[in-house]
């Protein structure tokens, strides 16, 4: 049986479990498997790119909502500039004043990314990042991981059922 959709995956899990008393918990087993895969999987299919326009004088912009881990931050200028990550403490120590210029470093504070020196002109930043797994549901029947690695979903969900 192919389990290429959430519905088919639930059916396959019910068949493997062969226990009617666990059927109502199958969505929970899938959710628990997704939580673990989100922490541990690092596949090419999870890589994404996002751009952000940095206005003159704007230090912070929102991060993508599906971001799990940043791989690279760059300023799309000529020449291209790859930025270095700094802890928030080091970020403010390195550039203690609000002077403007071309960003050299970035930091993460909550759901935002900050740039120092603060841009003195409008720039475009590109963030290459690993995304969280989009959760399966009755309204989201498939995702990249289920399409490319259905066995990971089956194994992960079954292992949660047997814990």
List the model feature ranges, each with a label.
Residues 1-163:
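Glycine-enriched, solvent-exposed interface loops adjoining structured elements
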